[in-house]
A protein has these predicted regions:
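Membrane-aqueous junction of the first/signal-anchor transmembrane helix
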Residues: 1-176
Length: 176
């Protein structure tokens, strides 16, 4: 009879340990790691092709990957945004000049969310590729920016809508 009582006690202890581990996992998954939070890895790949005369075609691939195990959505109805901007950098800058990513003359702008119908759903582990082509004058330096913004539905400390954002940028030379 003693062996049965010990086995019963061990089984109850293991069951309790499993419940505690499951509770810890659920707490971590939903509280600490932010299961409702979003993350998106954005990369830019560019290619310059000949076009007409001194014009070139800048082909831009905006690649997005949702690395998280849950989906998230961008919705224009909630004032979310997913934009691509191309800016011409000043050719006569002096040494030591720092160009900020959103500095320069705006050449082109594309609303990637609008082009997707106003609603963009990123499934878990999904990878997307949005391609845009822009005609640019040869012998030009441009900065390319892809920016994603999501309204969280809350307000910040100043009473303004709280916005999470993610962006990436690169600089491209358009050769002669």
């Amino acid at each position: 009879m003693k062996k049965i009582e010990i086995a019963d006690f061990v089984i109850r202890l293991l069951t309790l340990a499993a419940l505690v581990c499951g509770g810890f996992w659920a707490w971590y998954q939903y509280s600490e790691s932010g299961s409702t939070d979003w993350q998106n890895n954005i990369t830019l790949k560019t290619e310059v092709l000949p076009y007409l005369g001194d014009m070139r075609l800048l082909v831009i691939h905006v690649q997005s990957k949702n690395p998280r195990p849950n989906k998230f959505e961008l919705q224009s109805a909630k004032h979310d945004s997913f934009e691509l901007r191309v800016r011409r950098l000043k050719p006569d800058a002096v040494e030591g000049k720092v160009f900020h990513e959103d500095e320069g003359d705006l050449i082109a702008q594309a609303d990637l969310l609008k082009l997707a119908g106003g609603d963009y759903e990123f499934l878990p582990q999904a990878e997307m590729d949005d391609m845009q082509a822009v005609v640019v004058k040869a012998n030009t330096w441009v900065s390319v920016i892809a920016e994603m913004k999501i309204h969280t539905g809350t307000r910040d400390a100043h009473g303004q809508p709280d916005i999470d954002e993610n962006s990436t940028s690169t600089v491209v030379y358009i050769p002669k």
